[in-house]
Design a protein with these regions (language model features):
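A short glycine-rich, His/Asp/Glu-containing loop-to-beta-strand
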Residues: 1-28, 32, 140
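Short, conserved beta-strand element in jelly-roll/cupin
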Residues: 15-20, 29-46, 84-87
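Short beta-strand His + acidic residue motifs that chelate non-heme Fe in jelly-roll/DSBH
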Residues: 26, 45-46, 62, 68-74
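Short acidic-glycine-tyrosine-enriched beta hairpin
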Residues: 35, 49-65
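Surface-exposed, flexible loop/turn segments at secondary-structure boundaries
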Residues: 43, 51, 68, 88
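Double-stranded beta-helix
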Residues: 69-140
Length: 140
């Protein structure tokens, strides 16, 4: 399910571990719905230009077209489970990156409207996948 070939091509599942201040990605909207569950720690949601604090077990539902991004917050790492539909994942019409003052203040915003991830992520260093580390999840 987490490999190159999706067992369920209509569903995407990702686990993010974010240090305080680290964004999950860039402020964007998608043509498909997404859901996020904070498994541990604290996070900051920027949704439709507004900042909202999140804590463990908070669930966020973003209907299609909702502009959003999540960042790590608090004093330590947070763990966020992201689940989303993948019907429009590839090709034209997937969504886009929009300019937002709150997202830019946190280093999580594109500087121009675009649908091209190479443009939106140009100033961001490439992220490397890592294995689970002891202590990331509560009670582990």
């Amino acid at each position: 399910m987490f490999g190159d070939e999706a067992e369920f091509p209509q569903l995407g599942v990702n686990l993010f571990v974010l240090a305080p201040g680290d964004p999950m990605g860039m402020y964007h909207w998608e043509a498909d719905q997404e859901d996020f569950l904070v498994l541990a720690g604290e996070a900051l949601l920027i949704v439709e230009g507004e900042e909202r604090p999140l804590q463990q077990w908070d669930l966020v539902h973003c209907p299609a077209g909702t502009k959003h991004i999540i960042l790590g917050a608090g004093n330590g790492p947070c763990v966020v489970l992201a689940i989303g539909a993948r019907e429009h994942q590839n090709g034209a019409g997937w969504g886009g990156y929009t300019v937002d003052d709150a997202a830019l203040r946190h280093g999580a915003g594109a500087t121009e409207e675009t649908t091209d991830p190479l443009v939106a992520y140009a100033p961001v260093p490439r992220r490397e996948a890592t294995r689970y580390r002891e202590g990331w999840l509560p009670g582990a």
